[in-house]
């Protein structure tokens, strides 16, 4: 048996050739720019030819290294200096976004050029996003027409999914906001975005990157109100965006109201103070009584640890709700609010199985405490109830509803006798 270790082959002296398809011509940025500009100029503004040229050039030129230069040229016609002006003594091309016609159709055609390029060379995605973030910070260095074209193009690319809505962060730059550049740019951007998709798709993209609650920041701090935002964007023809932001603010205000209510209740603050706070919030954020009664109900029900035994939970619930009846009564001044509360009670008792037998007792308590009145209860019983557990709850309410109807008839006959 041979105990000698076999010598492993070494690679010294070996030279490996790069496969021809992996070779890239090594240029400095200026040489790279010259090659791209020369090729673009030869296309004669034919964007189909531009897309083909860019596709073919990626095999020879180092797009990965010079992505910024490539995108500068395609947008502005040449390499950009800090601030957004074209670098001194550079050659430039008119086959670019900034030299194109200022209309949606042309920008859609340019968007296709970027789309094809990025789909062909996936590694350019990140570089392109960084480029757009940079261009947005340079907005003050561009003319109004150049900004408009960039805004339209960006909106289309956002709609196509070539860009993430996180690029909008650049628009919150203090100087751009202060001078009104951000808001004006956003108008053009959102118009083209909504034109390609719709407000629901836009909202989804904004939500994905937690940008849905930040649109107010397009304005200086002293103008960050729903009223100002709504007027500005409605006047600019973007009513759907204005309504979306108004709804977002209302949703935010509701969440804040619920959170504060739960804290006030857990601290045991007087009902009078809670009522005053709620009324102020309703006025300030334009929240309806129907919405408020729903928030109050869920806050009241979530501020206590419920007994798990069905036979004990009803007694506990009645005691707890009796305490909060005056507060609830203050926000059921309309029949629709009473009906909303009835539906919330039904839903709660169905979703929390220990409360299935408590429904009728809660309704009777609220009737006696003048939180609920006859008409909404009868309407709920007749045709306004939910499907959830309806057979159980209607059966529970049968006798009480009959009593209400009899009481109503007696009251009517007494009135007639009096007449």
Curated annotation (Swiss-Prot):
Biased composition (Polar residues): 1-15
SUPFAM superfamilies: ARM repeat
GO biological process, one term: regulation of translational initiation
InterPro entries recorded: ARM-type_fold, eIF5-mimic_regulator, W2_BZW1/2, W2_domain
PROSITE patterns per record: W2 (PS51363)
Alphabetic keyword roster: Activator, Transcription, Transcription regulation, Translation regulation
PANTHER family: BASIC LEUCINE ZIPPER AND W2 DOMAIN-CONTAINING PROTEIN, EIF5-MIMIC PROTEIN 2
Similarity field: Belongs to the BZW family.
Protein name: eIF5-mimic protein 2
Record lineage: Eukaryota, Metazoa, Chordata, Craniata, Vertebrata
